[in-house]
Curated annotation (Swiss-Prot):
Residues binding GTP: 17, 71, 102, 163, 266-268
Domain Radical SAM core: 8-230
Family of the protein in this entry: Belongs to the radical SAM superfamily. MoaA family.
Protein name per Swiss-Prot or TrEMBL: GTP 3',8-cyclase
Binding site for [4Fe-4S] cluster 1: 24, 28, 31
Keyword Iron: yes
Broad enzyme group: lyase
Species: Staphylococcus aureus (strain bovine RF122 / ET3-1)
Amino acid sequence: MVEQIKDKLGRPIRDLRLSVTDRCNFRCDYCMPKEVFGDDFVFLPKNELLTFDEMARIAKVYAELGVKKIRITGGEPLMRRDLDVLIAKLNQIDGIEDIGLTTNGLLLKKHGQKLYDAGLRRINVSLDAIDDTLFQSINNCNIKATTILEQIDYATSIGLNVKVNVVIQKGINDDQIIPMLEYFKDKHIEIRFIEFMDVGNDNGWDFSKVVTKDDMLTMIEQHFEIDPVEPKYFGEVAKYYRHKDNGVQFGLITSVSQSFCSTCTRARLSSDGKFYGCLFATVDGFNVKAFIRSGVTDEELKEQFKALWQIRDDRYSDERTAQTVANRQRKKINMNYIGG
């Protein structure tokens, strides 16, 4: 029987984000900049990662507390060996209605069919430019945008439902909004533009680099005829619009200018096995991995997860100002540990 629990701000728990690795084959400046994550950077050893059995056990307990959706993140999750094994395990859990995965897309041709066969049906591909030269400068690994576009075509050809995520930075890739919207509109693929966020400690974020949803919308309305779309469910993070001529939708994610803390229903498990109640959390999350490996029962695990959720009061984006960003004393967990 599913228990209905809420946090201190009255928010239910509906989603679980599982980071399966801290490794990535890109070095995007806003997430894993090359000067920080260089050749000598020490990533987590295998024994510091949760096993697939541990993840499935955690997901099963969370399902009993109301979680219906699971998203697999990283790092780059396709770098975790035998990920299809985890997908298959998660698909067997009662109450889990949706499993998604966020990826940079580079390894979709290599692993996509196995993941589909294991039950994965929905992926988000991160692609911050459609121009090859610009995209190479963003990922810092000489990967062309056309390479990822080919991977996306492959993913759709095998039956995966693909959405594309684009982090927009002022003066870097804001000129990509219109060409990317045009390209994916013609492909009938949903694209979502995300305001640049201050996740982690190494991405050089400040307010001047943010292109707000209103600015994006003004730009888009000069080129396309669109209508707003009503939210589909409580906690939906994107504001959706529909092209009038062919009905294809796109989204704008207002993570800075119009926060959605009040409807956030996500629990997050980092690649090193810690619980966090917020994408912008500090680095002292509850160590679920150590707790599980101490020999606790499922009932003890459930009680711990209940307690963690019921004391949750995170609302970082509601409280974000230039001063709070500058004065934040405690380091936030980096993106490669907690996913997007």
